[in-house]
Amino acid sequence: MKLRLDKYLADMGIGTRTEVKKAIIKGQVRVNEETVKRPEIKIDTEKDHVFYQGKPVAYAEYEYYMLNKPAGVVSATEDKNDRTVLELIEEKQRKDLFPVGRLDKDTEGLLLITNDGELAHQLLSPKKHVDKVYFARIDGKVTEEDIRRFAEGLEIGEEKPTLPAYLEILETEEISEIRLTIREGKFHQVKRMFHAVGKEVIYLKRLQMGSLVLDPQLALGEYRELTGQELEALRDCSSLR
């Protein structure tokens, strides 16, 4: 892919187009072994080597991060009142990243951060029915009857019932622990489903989205780039090849 030098640097977060143009004109940018002072020259992202103030700037058209979202941050690109998930991604190069879908402010777990709009669309499309797996603690005893009702679909105040969901009881006491697989992503869906059977979610964590499984080595608030294998599997499960 070929890009103007100023766009290349702006895309990689060096600064605004105006700022990087000034840096180029001042001689702070080298392409391969030559200092370049023309912002408009074309860069081949696959062949050329760009340096800013002596440091290499590799071009990444898309970035993909797995985040273990902590409670207390919001799934948004910006927010006036709360810290956002993007503020946790300190090593990001691009400024156009966004969370794929959303987790409630008090919900923890797997969140994909990227700037790949086509992949995000495929993963979130209601036509794709990409599985999402959650662990939850529930106030009250979860029963076999609840399993049956979840499998049939529940009325949660929408035009249609939820799609069949797979509910697995891990522990059933006054505070139950469960694992739930749903195939859609309605607003507050897990909480509303349990409310429909007379119970309340007191803790919620997403473990998996499609083929992407939360890395158990990631502490809350930590993130890492997706591996090539993880990205390929995600594209497979969303039929994006």
Task: Annotate each PLM feature.
Residues 2-241:
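Basic, flexible Lys/Arg- and Gly-enriched helix-loop patches that mediate nucleic-acid binding at interfaces
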